[in-house]
């Protein structure tokens, strides 16, 4: 049977990434408290394509995914990418995995337990060297310092999303990153709150106002202090409750470069 994908292409144009995208697939993730956690991921898998090949073999991506479905973790991510390169005759391979991750949280006053969902991601690539990035998206509450200062009856507050991505030299637990990020907002977010919890969360946020600039700077300070992390990016987006726009801030640091531990600037003013 003829193999059309292997036929020669005469346009002399290589392709950086080609593959399969948005695969819904069950995976098993390492859990700090329960050893493992079963979840369902959205997965993208790509390789490069040399200029002389007409196409890649899409079915081979799924075959490789089937082999690693119970073993998608940092320990074997490089081996999975190497298998992609070999099976598809590629010079580079890439995989992006996004999945919901659940942590049991206690409400701050009542102690009521509930599961909290966080969006997490793995991004890995292999060409001449292996690269891996762990990412998390954490909802928090933010309360505007400027609104609090100017108002007699309260301050506007809103739900925010903080996104942190890290490269590291030693293993980092998802739970540990989430704990760091949740401490950078005015208050954490909970899936279950009783009346006494709502009072606690509301008052805590009011006593702990944060600009979006404050949030990314506080996260940066904490991540700079973690020796096992070599690179990171931090983003914060406030879904403003009294504006028709979001507030946004971002910081990226490569700790292997000189000067990344310099003191950061003071928070910006309300504008």
UniProtKB/Swiss-Prot annotation:
Enzyme class: hydrolase
Claim: Phosphoprotein is one of the keywords in the record: no
Keywords, alphabetical: Hydrolase
Pfam families reported in the protein's UniProt record: GCHY-1
Alphabetized InterPro entries for the sequence: GTP_cyclohydrolase_FolE2 (IPR022838), GTP_cyclohydrolase_FolE2/MptA (IPR003801)
GO biological process: tetrahydrofolate biosynthetic process
Entry EC no(s): 3.5.4.16
Residues the UniProt record annotates as site (May be catalytically important): 144
Catalytic activity line of the entry: GTP + H2O = 7,8-dihydroneopterin 3'-triphosphate + formate + H(+)
Domain of life: Bacteria
Summary of the function given for this chain in its UniProt record: Converts GTP to 7,8-dihydroneopterin triphosphate.
NCBIfam families in the record: PRK13674.1-1
PANTHER family, per database record: GTP CYCLOHYDROLASE MPTA (PTHR36445:SF1)
Name under which the protein is recorded: GTP cyclohydrolase FolE2
Species this protein is from: Geotalea uraniireducens (strain Rf4) (Geobacter uraniireducens)
Lineage: Bacteria, Pseudomonadati, Thermodesulfobacteriota, Desulfuromonadia, Geobacterales
